[in-house]
Amino acid sequence: MAKKKTEKQKDFVKPKLRVGKTKAKPDNHTDTSFVAKSISLPNQSIAQKSDKNDEKDFLHQLSLTKHHSSTTRKEVLKSISSQLPSNPSLYKQILSSIMPLVHDSSQQVREEVASLLQKCAETQSGLLDLHITSVILFVHSAMSHIQPDIRSSSTKFLDIVLQHASEAVARSYFVKTLRSFFTIMSWNLRDDKKSLSLAVTTSSSIGGTSKKARVGHLAVLLRFLESTLFQKTAETTSVPINYIHPQTSHYMLPTNPHPYASLKLFTQETPQADDMFSLASLESLATDDLDTRRKIVHDVFQEPLRKNLTNLVKEGGEVGREAKSCLGVLDRLESS
């Protein structure tokens, strides 16, 4: 009892401190002498994102165009279309990512690709001219694809290319594009029995073309013939034009990729012995000038075109009207 009383009295006894010795700290003492250091994270600013992060996010979206889900691919294409970049160098990667989707099995994905391609061409003028080699390769492949749905939507992409880069198509891919129309419409270029049976076999193996799809194909064929066989008329504007010296073009960089093609140094552009182009010689011909394209149509394609278009006119309806319009273009070409 006396021991406990002594321990309680110790709590009220004032300790005698020696000189220079600090007071003992209690057991529950918390040290507050430290100073916090600030942490700076400039790349994680909420107010404004850095351009590098934006570009990384955009490239990540482009990688999702290869996603296994068609719904994801469609939504990614919509997102890219709604926020196209201002940096022109990124459009090459956009085309490299979306053009393989021309062969996509989903119709909704192909429609989004067409919409995005149209928007890219409108945003960056000259984009399709610059990348015409890779773009037209996928379009021609789609026009001869084994799946009917992909063939049916292929001319939508060709229509976009013709709207923005018809001159590039006419100069470098006139013959291949025109032959692709014969493939997609199951037309025959020759009248011999062997070619006719081959055309019938090919048509049955790849499946027939629906009436709605044929209307679209003929409409694009009409645009193709008009844009490649006739000179474009200059649009009249009210903006004053400054006079340019007529010799200026001789000192400027050429606008076409083959400025010396007219000299026929590396191509065979001369007709055969009978002064007629043949189907076998089309692959080695250059179609840079308008007269060569017109002569190719006159010598090789005009007769089978008229024959097949006349058969479609007899069907009537929208197909007949579009076919008649194409025949009108051939008549204009014949009279010019």
Swiss-Prot record:
Gene3D superfamilies: Leucine-rich Repeat Variant. Component of the RIX1 complex required for processing of ITS2 sequences from 35S pre-rRNA. Residues 1-36 are annotated as: Disordered. GO terms for biological process: maturation of LSU-rRNA from tricistronic rRNA transcript (SSU-rRNA, 5.8S rRNA, LSU-rRNA); pre-replicative complex assembly involved in nuclear cell cycle DNA replication; regulation of DNA-templated DNA replication initiation; ribosomal large subunit assembly. GO terms for cellular component: cytosol; nucleoplasm; rixosome complex. The gene is IPI1. Keywords: Nucleus, Ribosome biogenesis, rRNA processing. Pfam families: Ipi1_N (PF12333). GO terms for molecular function: chromatin binding. It is found in: Nucleus. Belongs to the IPI1/TEX10 family. This is Pre-rRNA-processing protein IPI1. Component of the RIX1 complex, composed of IPI1, RIX1/IPI2 and IPI3 in a 1:2:2 stoichiometry. The complex interacts (via RIX1) with MDN1 (via its hexameric AAA ATPase ring) and the pre-60S ribosome particles. InterPro entries: ARM-like, ARM-type_fold, Ipi1_N. Its main location: nucleus.
